[in-house]
Amino acid sequence: PYTAYFAKKSYIENNQTTIQNFTNAIYKGQKWVKEHTAKEIAESIKNFFPDTDIKLLTTAIQSYKDIDAWNEIPVLKQESFDKLQEVMSLAGELKVKAPYDKIVNNKYAQEAIK
């Protein structure tokens, strides 16, 4: 995945509505990116990159689209989780890999995509 989000189990348990609303918003953004061209996306975010030429920004976005860097749904699959941990390990940011079934909670993602 391009990115993943995490929270403590206690936070999730005590803030279920917030977690669901956040996940719904992420999914809405994922759908928007899927349904729009690189140029349209670049136009919508160009103000966040004032020193970047719109052509370069469009090219970068298209590159991400071409390699499927952005997931289309917020569900974190085992394969993506493993890849994320591998990247973090290679970067020296992760000492011990975590088991998927103990860490990942797709409950809110599954609800968002209904």
What do these predicted ranges mean?
Residues 1-12, 23-26, 62-66, 101-113:
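Periplasmic-binding protein-like
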Residues 82-114:
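Conserved C-terminal helix/tail region of periplasmic/extracytoplasmic solute-binding proteins
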Residues 12-94:
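Secondary-structure end/capping motifs
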